[in-house]
Amino acid sequence: MNIHEYQAKQILKRFGISVPEGVIVHSLNEVNDAINKINSKVIVVKAQIHAGGRGKAGGVIVSRTLDEAKTAIKNMLGSTLVTHQTSKDGQKVRKVYLEEGCDIKKEYYISAIVNRKHGQISIIFSTEGGVDIEEVAANSPEKVVTCNIDPIFGFQGFHGRNLCFDSNLSVDQTRKITSIAKKIYKTMLETDASQIEINPLIETSSGDFIALDAKMNFDDNAIYRHPEILELRDYDEEIPEEIEASKHGLSYIKMDGNIGCMVNGAGLAMATMDIIKYYGAEPANFLDVGGGASQQTVTEAFKIILSDNVDGILVNIFGGIMRCDIIANGIIAAIQEIGINVPLVVRLSGTNFELGKKLLDNSKLNIITAHDLSEAAYDIVNIVKK
């Protein structure tokens, strides 16, 4: 689950990390009151969307007068922002964050992620923070330092010193960055966050370190333990199909192609998308119905896929725990209930797959069955291309 920048800063502030003072604005009626709450000659207007790259896309504007700030807010609210992390259609700006300007001496980068390979939290640090951190990581990887934290011992002082060792930082700077890294680590543990990113972490001329921008997302499997964080969820920033899928226990990710996929198992779903691309088409989604899909689950899955205006659907099911004849009956019932006006290719394998295939073939519905995944992908791609 993702949250907005201003929400992430509220959490970081609770854990002792300094952030600029700011006010969230939802409508033009709130502008005057919001500006009056910020005691700064410089006001930074920031679009609040669940995507990075806002600075280069015009989503962060520094205003040095009240009129400039009001104009920026007026132009930004309700606009559509397109960044390298959004789709080509961009995301609508429904709220903006007004923040006091800061005296920036130096920009740094610091983040924490769950390192699944090592089963640890990794702290990442660079003295080259800012909007071009991706370029720094790609072109000068030696300027990006990673430190893995053993969960048995937790974050220790030497971890911070290791992060700063080759950065020519003073003892005082190292001490302050170590303190911030330790607080980020604690935040990760206590909130079940899967990522925390501060970019930039700025140093002011007075030597203070402030989180000028922040990003956080959380482990969906642990969010039930944090109702206060779940309340921060902004459904307007999420894809409607993905929200609907989660209500029915389906794992769904919207993509840019035109062939819908319904599969059981994440690995099989990825393989299905790969083979669709291999035959020259693009998948419209990742949809995993899980290992215990019922007729109702299959029906809801079809509804979600069809809401995306796909040109064809490929169903790829391996019957392990789930029997293929039950899935076949679910497919037939779903089609009879909602109707499907696009080509449908089904590949069944595993427990009772012969019976499942026979049920589909004898259903007198417009269903094409395939013997294996390669044949199924080839069939749906070529039918859609005609």
Curated annotation (Swiss-Prot):
UniProt key word Plastid: no
Positions contributing to ATP binding: K46, G53, R54, G55, E99, C102, E107
Binding sites annotated in the UniProt record for Mg(2+): N199, D213
Superkingdom as given in the UniProt entry: Bacteria
A GO molecular-function annotation: succinate-CoA ligase (ADP-forming) activity
GO BP annotations, alphabetical order: succinyl-CoA metabolic process; tricarboxylic acid cycle
Entry EC no(s): 6.2.1.5
Catalytic activity, reaction form: succinate + ATP + CoA = succinyl-CoA + ADP + phosphate; GTP + succinate + CoA = succinyl-CoA + GDP + phosphate
Keywords per UniProt: ATP-binding, Ligase, Magnesium, Metal-binding, Nucleotide-binding, Tricarboxylic acid cycle
A Pfam family it matches: Ligase_CoA
Assigned protein family: Belongs to the succinate/malate CoA ligase beta subunit family.
Entries under PANTHER family matching the protein: SUCCINATE--COA LIGASE [GDP-FORMING] SUBUNIT BETA, MITOCHONDRIAL, SUCCINYL-COA SYNTHETASE BETA CHAIN
Protein's name in the database: Succinate--CoA ligase [ADP-forming] subunit beta
Organism: Ehrlichia ruminantium (strain Gardel)
Gene: sucC
